[in-house]
Swiss-Prot record:
Positions annotated to bind FMN: R125, S126, S127, N238, A239, G278, K293, P294, T295, S296, S297, R319
Native source species: Bordetella avium (strain 197N)
GO cellular component: cytosol
Family matches, as PANTHER family: CHORISMATE SYNTHASE (PTHR21085:SF0)
Catalytic reaction(s) noted: 5-O-(1-carboxyvinyl)-3-phosphoshikimate = chorismate + phosphate
Protein name listed in UniProt: Chorismate synthase
Length: 352
């Protein structure tokens, strides 16, 4: 009911606030016997960690994961896995000027309307800081999927604001702070972000996530379709305002003779469906595209109201991502992996 848990058989319950003592999650339903240590999880967390370039928030968090339970002698036991990440660089005083006001475009207003109170420090529960436990859980899912099925989940940025990023090579993705698959365009991205930071403003982005080498048959129609659960999970990522599978909204202009992926004895001739038909995986790569909105915490002064309903001008100080999409790629990968492992286990339970 509370909305803090993702999954049916592989369940992840997320907890914590941006400026609390710690954040973390409990992973319940991980199969026993998976080799796992903190380094497996830390590799993924380091890809998402803040303060790694001038283009992201300068909050300095080590994001060191602690495995509290569910692993013995380097192997999962099948019991709940507790993961903890301590907050070490919170600056709550940066938010004193907005404690009683609502940032335009932020969850400040809706959280207050729902709960009648809110934690203004760093956005509290609505902060993107809470994606770190998601990435930690996703690291476990990624490892199991790779070992059991050879499934690879990876992503990249395909657009930053008005700048489209042509895909060149997966090899380029880990070599720049944008997760851009094109080294030649990185200087343009850097110049754009430098100008944006000087303006005190923010921008959105588009992220692509792909899962390859998964079998056909995953997905539970009609209400737990694979693509429906993917969209559900992705919309749980802060700042996501749009999710498409395969050709997505491009399907509108395609004729059926183009959109329907023809099949030969050697396999499919295209993948407009994005690897999912009727809510079930086809064995083709699952392709997902995300639209990330601009960060709402900006230095540009904007109009809003306070808790008394009085008009105010809001300017957000502190340390914030001018484009949350820059660090969104490993988070989106984690969410896709979490959905896939859940459906893999559900399929195994029903169909063997």
């Amino acid at each position: 009911m509370s909305g803090n848990t993702l999954g049916s058989l592989f369940r992840v319950t997320n907890f914590g606030e941006s400026h609390g003592p710690a954040i973390g999650c409990v992973v319940d339903g991980c199969p026993p016997g998976l080799p796992l240590d903190a380094a497996d999880i830390q590799r993924e967390l380091d890809r998402r960690r803040p303060g790694t370039s001038r283009h992201v928030t300068q909050r300095q968090e080590a994001d060191q994961v602690e495995i509290l339970s569910g692993v013995y002698e380097g192997v999962t036991t099948g019991t709940p896995i507790g993961l903890l990440i301590r907050n070490i660089d919170a600056r709550s005083k940066d938010y004193s000027n907005i404690a009683d006001t609502f940032r335009p475009g932020h969850a400040d207003y809706s959280y207050w309307k729902k709960f009648g109170q809110r934690d203004p420090r760093g956005g509290g529960r609505s902060s993107a800081r809470l994606t770190a436990p998601t990435v930690a859980a996703g690291a476990i899912a990624k490892k199991w999927l790779a070992q059991q099925h050879g499934t690879i989940v990876r992503g990249y940025m395909s657009q930053l604001g008005p700048i489209e990023i042509p895909f060149v090579s997966w090899d380029e993705v880990p070599n720049n702070p944008f997760y851009a698959p094109n080294a030649a365009i990185v200087p343009e991205l850097e110049a754009y972000m430098d100008a944006l930071r000087r303006d005190g403003d923010s921008i959105g982005a588009r992220i692509e996530v792909v899962a390859e080498h998964l079998p056909a048959g995953w997905g539970e129609p009609i209400y737990d379709r694979l693509d429906a659960d993917i969209a559900h999970a992705m919309m749980g990522l802060n700042a996501v305002k749009g999710v498409s599978i395969g050709a997505g909204f491009g399907s509108i202009t395609q004729r059926g003779s183009e959109h329907g992926d023809e099949i030969t004895p050697d396999g499919f001739l295209s993948n407009h469906a994005g690897g999912v038909l009727g809510g079930i995986s086809t064995g083709q790569p699952v392709t997902v595209s995300l639209a990330i909105k601009p960060t709402s915490s900006i230095r540009v002064e904007r109009r809003s109201v306070n808790r008394a309903g009085e008009p105010v001008n809001v300017q957000t100080l502190g340390r914030h991502d001018p484009c949350v999409g820059i660090r969104a790629t490993p988070i989106a990968e984690a969410l896709l992996a979490l959905v896939l492992i859940d459906h893999a286990l559900r399929h195994r339970g029903q169909c063997g």
